[in-house]
Amino acid sequence: MAASVVKTPKCPRRGSAKEQQSKASPKSNNESNNWHWWILLASVFLITFATRFYKVTEPDHICWDETHFGKMGSWYINRTFFFDVHPPLGKMLIGLSGYLTGYNGTFPFEKPGDKYNETAYQGMRYFCTTLGALIMPMGFDTVYDLTRSHEAALLSAAYLIFDVGLLTLNQYILLDPILLFFMMGSVWGMVKISKATASGGSYSVRWWFWLFLTGTMLSCTISVKFVGLFVVLLVGLHTATELWLILGDLGQPIVETLKQIACRAIALILWPILLYTLFFYIHLSVLNRSGNGDGFYSSAFQSRLIGNSLYNASMPRDVAYGSVVTIKNHKTGGGYLHSHFHLYPKGSGARQQQITTYTHKDDNNKWVIKPHNKQRLPKDKLQLLRHGDLVRLEHLVTKRNLHSHSEPAPMTKKHLQVTGYGESGVGDANDVWRVLIVGGKVNETVHTVTSRLMLIHYLQNCALTSSGKQLPKWGFEQQEVSCNLNVRDKYAHWNVEDNEHKLLPSVSFSVYAPGFFARFLESHAVMLQGNAGLKPKEGEVTSRPWQWPINYRGQFFSGSSYRIYLLGNPVIWWSNLVFLALFVAVFLGNAILEQRRAGQARALVRSQADSEDSEPSTTDVPLCTCCPEEQQLLSRPREEHRDPLGAAAWLFVGWLLHYLPFWAMGRVLYFHHYFPALIFNSLLTGVMFHHIIQSLPRWIQHVLLGGLLSLIVYSFALFSPLAYGMSGPLANEPNSTMHSLKWLSTWEF
């Protein structure tokens, strides 16, 4: 019996005459595209630098957070140690740029509005502005690689260039332009790696260059601010997806996947970790002199700082009655037990002297250890302090005793209030505390620095603790001290830091100085705790994440007669939201359509299989020999630079990662925290614009692009005084030149 012949279904070839023509002359098209690309890139560079460097040295006074980061740059130049909640790279670069451009580190940067006068501040502004300006060319090239569309790349770059908010953030001595530069560089490198891999360029010099550049950018981003973790997550997810697709490529051996994993682990994990550690090594090596941030760190950490009382310290190892000591809370970032002449206000417990913790060195941190049942010891008698002893602690300056009673604490109402009580060291039975060494034994001597102590109130049986809560203005925003009836409170541990006693022999404490990795870990613990504990200052304008995408309220950078106001270009921000919504709608619609097509393809395969079962054939025939369209229903190309919707999806993920986490943060938040997410939204807008109009005739595409570009340039011209400076009446006054631009009542310019 003759074998039956199965006819191969023919598929109509698709493609317009225009497409056939473009395939016939790819070289001329590529040359034309290259020229267009270079012309557009040069235009982006010129317009970006022109808008960013215009009036970059104005105003000639401190604006907003320049008071912090300019001051920290000065401390790097002077090698003075300080505490900050952010990693060090951004501030080191600010200090380096100032040093290289003639700034000597002596300007105090006390408060916004202070005139720079003859200070060479310009170099630091130029540096930050240059990095901020480089974001736009990188954004242009990133979108072009994702879409191969000049229109999409140009529109995305224009959305970044003509946003007055991003312009304002780029022109000052701040961490934000540095952070945004490295973040954009990470995304740029991520796309370049994907492009090189897809074109078969794995393991080439170019591929390795982009791999290590991306790892460098990732390390630098998180070394400026911890929010750099969000772009690390984005690149990590993208890399994992690429590796998964490589694993699924049956044309490649499994060894290829393992090689790709190893290469990316080296360049995107190990290399960034090494760089990050190196930045901290430089930071801790440069800042080797004692400063006002010493008290946030442990006593052992401080012993490495030149000028600190513990540096090469020689003091008594043992603690004795009559010792004048400072007592530091042992938790990460803990302060010194402190008092001053001010009383607790009415409604905050007994109106007795305040007891707080304070993170700076001060004579008000000093206490005298006395026996619980005697006022004074004979001057020539030495009695060591031991585990389990009952003592009174007299404040050296105010002569009041550390005291607690059954009144509730001012902030933590479940705790008892701790006060300073008595006169000239004479008080009552509520001044008595039992000293316990954590893990101590009977008659064990209390040692300076190394002994971890608890102070248990004799009558109330509560533990002296630092709750970590910040007191209001009446407490000078210092930390609350209370007495916790739960004596297992982890914040109830203390140590003696400074110890003075003329009868005790002194020993060197250099043996307790920690090495680099111990200080590296402690620095992170202190930074993370400080970041989580950031609270708004009284009268300070803060914001919540829901306000940011809608441009609800801005933020003053300079509130003098020369006003600078951080606010997004409303045309750009609100149209960004429109394109964000369009992406979600188109993506969901496309997903539904893809699922329906996949179902049709599976049904077609089952039908073919049933036909073969009923009529056996000796010939295996593909579903379609002239085109793979039915097969592509099950397997479609996933290369972002050929799939605008796939590219937009990754930019949307970037927007989500840089926006949604702020909803869960309890710390104080500000409007400028949204700008990393804004960059992703602006890139997404360009990609979606291209995706929506690409099927239209070219002349209509050009009209739409020209109209949108004209609109955002015009809106930039209207709102540019917000960035370049305003004077005269505020916008809420009818005679103000900005009156007609106050589109929302919450805008305060």
Curated annotation (Swiss-Prot):
Its main location: endoplasmic reticulum. It is found in: Endoplasmic reticulum membrane. Keywords: Developmental protein, Endoplasmic reticulum, Glycoprotein, Glycosyltransferase, Membrane, Repeat, Transferase, Transmembrane, Transmembrane helix. It holds the Pfam family MIR. SMART domains: MIR. It catalyses: a di-trans,poly-cis-dolichyl beta-D-mannosyl phosphate + L-seryl-[protein] = 3-O-(alpha-D-mannosyl)-L-seryl-[protein] + a di-trans,poly-cis-dolichyl phosphate + H(+); a di-trans,poly-cis-dolichyl beta-D-mannosyl phosphate + L-threonyl-[protein] = 3-O-(alpha-D-mannosyl)-L-threonyl-[protein] + a di-trans,poly-cis-dolichyl phosphate + H(+). PROSITE patterns: MIR. It is a multi-pass membrane protein. GO terms for biological process: muscle organ development. The keyword Membrane applies. GO terms for molecular function: dolichyl-phosphate-mannose-protein mannosyltransferase activity. Rt/POMT1 and tw/POMT2 function as a protein O-mannosyltransferase in association with each other to generate and maintain normal muscle development. Interacts with Rt/POMT1. This is Protein O-mannosyl-transferase 2. It comes from Drosophila pseudoobscura pseudoobscura (Fruit fly).
